[in-house]
Design a protein with these regions (language model features):
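Catalytic domains that recognize anionic headgroups
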Residues: 1-478
Length: 478
């Protein structure tokens, strides 16, 4: 019997498809020689629901742990509240690969994708690289933050209560200036601690850890590796280190998100993509030297994209327009250490959650390669389940009556906390809003920037897409 293939997924967090093509020449070169899915759709608009969906092939809204209103509860961060994003007994992709005889290993630079959020369920080894990569540049500040986190939810409640009590002793005009000053100070402190103005956000450490794992612990069993690199995530290396990158100050109108500011952030993003592309080359080269590509399927993709002023939006975890829903998806097959030149370019809509079944098919021996045989999605779905930044919801709700700044941010967060679902079929895309905002319909082949809503002339098509979404089973590929 032939030996099972290694399967390695390199997930480049926050990389949007259009900019991957424009700013990552090595990835683009691989895509031309391998199999490239040109209309890959992320199942959700931020890390947690997207990974949860990819790991289970379930629609994100059907997973109770990821579909909560994090702004209302405040239970979003995995540190204070030790929140879980999948059930303890979830039969994840890693769990099922382990049952097929694979050694399953996770290398993560994302603090949500970790050993204690259950998104790592099923992996036999988890390298929480983010612990060092997200706090290596200001150890003193990191230690201070860690001491607060150890207090858990009780500590946060005390901090909120103390902040509100202090605000009540101030004149209202003073609350605004103090709150805004502290928020900007926090933004700069985080930037100083996590290397915002540097290019590397853990890629070098990831390559080192992967090489060390192969040298020390590789057991010659078939490998399923999942690697998350976070270089493309905000914040970004911009010219002035005093530049505020808090998206809620911009979305609320407190800071102006003009074209110059959006371009500045985008330039920083493209610098990171160029760096990430070079590290992708180094990672693939290391895997080849170590013999890990002798009989391997390599998948390169992302969990969501990023906004830079399009539709008046910034970053992600916002409404599902193309900039955040379309991601790169490239499958590369290696036989006897050499890349198989498939030269396939597929234009049909494919949800990245379809990787779940495609990878299991290779692991079980049903398929030998991933080269265009991944199931196209008749209706591909991308969901915005609400904003991810619910960490300060409780504080904002208590300060909003005394601070116009807090009120603006709180109301803006409420606005974008509205659920919305994008449903794709062929060239047509419906965005259905679960609130007091009208649905929108686009022909994304003719109008990829979604500038012209055509729903008034195509209501039957919009109804067809919405009905398909409502009637389908809670799996992403329907």
């Amino acid at each position: 019997m032939d030996r099972k293939r290694n399967i390695i997924v390199l997930l480049l967090d926050t990389v949007r498809a259009a900019d991957a093509r424009a700013g990552m020449p090595l990835l683009s070169g691989i895509a031309r020689r391998a199999t490239s899915y040109e209309n890959a759709v992320s199942p959700a608009t931020w890390t947690v629901p997207s990974h949860a969906s990819m790991f289970t092939n379930m629609r994100a809204s059907s997973i109770r742990q990821t579909a909560r209103d994090f702004l209302a509860t405040g239970s979003i961060d995995p540190w204070f509240t030790q929140v879980k994003f999948l059930p303890e007994n979830a039969h994840t992709l890693a769990y099922n690969m382990a049952r097929l005889g694979y050694t399953t290993t996770l290398f993560s630079n994302n603090p949500f994708l970790t050993s204690f959020t259950n998104l790592g369920a099923g992996f036999s080894r988890i390298y929480d690289l983010w612990i060092d990569s997200n706090g290596q540049y200001d150890r003193k500040l990191t230690r201070r933050f860690a001491s607060i986190l150890r207090g858990g939810e009780r500590t946060r409640a005390r901090m909120v209560a103390a902040s509100v009590a202090v605000s009540r002793m101030m004149p209202k005009p003073m609350v605004d200036s103090v709150y805004l000053s502290l928020r900007k100070r926090l933004d700069r402190s985080v930037a100083r601690a996590d290397g915002t103005h540097r290019l590397d956000r853990g890629a070098n450490a990831t390559i080192h850890s992967m090489a060390e794992y192969i040298d020390r612990d590789y057991d010659f069993a078939p490998q399923f590796m999942f690697v998350n690199c976070i270089e493309a995530h905000e914040n970004y290396p911009v010219q002035s280190r005093d530049t505020i990158q808090d998206k809620w100050l911009y979305l609320s109108g407190i800071n102006e998100l003009d074209e110059g500011t959006a371009r500045m952030f985008h330039r920083g993003y493209m610098r990171r993509l160029g760096y990430l592309d070079r590290k992708l080359g180094a990672m693939v080269g290391m895997l080849k030297v170590k013999g890990m590509l002798d009989n391997t399927t390599l998948v390169i993709t992302s969990d969501h994209g990023q906004f830079f002023g399009e539709h008046g939006l910034l970053y992600h975890s916002l409404f599902p327009y193309e900039e955040v829903t379309k991601v790169p998806l490239v499958a590369v097959n290696y036989d006897n250490g050499r890349m198989v030149a498939d030269h396939e370019r597929l234009d049909s809509n494919v949800s990245t959650s379809s990787l779940y079944r495609a990878i299991l098919d290779i692991g079980s021996g049903k398929e030998n390669h991933l080269n265009g045989n991944m199931k196209a999605s008749k209706y591909a779905v991308s969901e915005h389940l609400g904003i991810s930044e619910g960490w300060d919801g409780q504080l904002l709700s208590k300060l909003k009556d005394r601070s116009s700044v807090a009120r603006k941010i709180y109301e803006t967060k409420q606005k974008y906390n509205m659920r919305a679902t994008a449903v794709y079929s062929g060239n047509m895309k419906l965005i259905h809003f679960f609130g007091d905002r009208k649905d929108e319909l686009y022909d994304v082949a003719k109008d990829p920037r979604e500038t012209t809503d055509i729903i008034s002339a195509h209501r039957e098509e919009a109804h067809r897409l919405l009905s398909a979404y409502r009637l389908s089973k809670p799996f992403v590929a329907v």
